[in-house]
């Protein structure tokens, strides 16, 4: 069972308690600290849309500590980041792996950050299939199509060629925060605000 802390704020009208994530949302901070699933993606997308409706001119700060997860759920978050008017600053804390790294790279240019000891990992998508040969072929073709789409987007986000991305994601490719800057996944490493 996970524990969510509450914070209490006082003002002239009295006290109010918030779960920590709701309180962070007031400061335009969204936190993804789990696997990318349909449920977690829907929460992130809803928060982004809410913050855009509140003030489309202010940045959203998207903190990522995720092992990755579902490609389709990740695309829902990524597409929303590109769709909304707000700049989305991405910040890696801990690890951004797989779809987590993909989302990290999708932040607004110049606003993709990582803390000094963060790790970033990119690789090709994986999946499995059962059934008749025809079904297996359909799934395999879809995985290849998805891989090409991911590679094209990562190439655009990093300044690398699609061929370089394809080669570099053949197997798990771990990077330090500084290596991720050199690779073009992020723009800088930050130690203090």
UniProtKB/Swiss-Prot annotation:
The keyword Protease applies. The keyword Metal-binding does not apply. It is found in: Cytoplasm. One of its GO terms (cellular component) is endopeptidase Clp complex. One of its GO terms (biological process) is protein quality control for misfolded or incompletely synthesized proteins. It catalyses: Hydrolysis of proteins to small peptides in the presence of ATP and magnesium. alpha-casein is the usual test substrate. In the absence of ATP, only oligopeptides shorter than five residues are hydrolyzed (such as succinyl-Leu-Tyr-|-NHMec, and Leu-Tyr-Leu-|-Tyr-Trp, in which cleavage of the -Tyr-|-Leu- and -Tyr-|-Trp bonds also occurs). Keywords: Cytoplasm, Hydrolase, Protease, Serine protease. The active site is at residues 98, 123. Its EC number is 3.4.21.92. GO terms for molecular function: ATP-dependent peptidase activity; ATPase binding; serine-type endopeptidase activity. It is an enzyme of class 3 (hydrolase). InterPro entries: ClpP, ClpP/crotonase-like_dom_sf, ClpP/TepA, ClpP_His_AS, ClpP_Ser_AS. It comes from the Bacteria. NCBIfam families: clpP, PRK00277.1, PRK12553.1. PANTHER family: ATP-DEPENDENT CLP PROTEASE PROTEOLYTIC SUBUNIT. Belongs to the peptidase S14 family. Fourteen ClpP subunits assemble into 2 heptameric rings which stack back to back to give a disk-like structure with a central cavity, resembling the structure of eukaryotic proteasomes. Cleaves peptides in various proteins in a process that requires ATP hydrolysis. Has a chymotrypsin-like activity. Plays a major role in the degradation of misfolded proteins. This is ATP-dependent Clp protease proteolytic subunit. The gene is clpP.
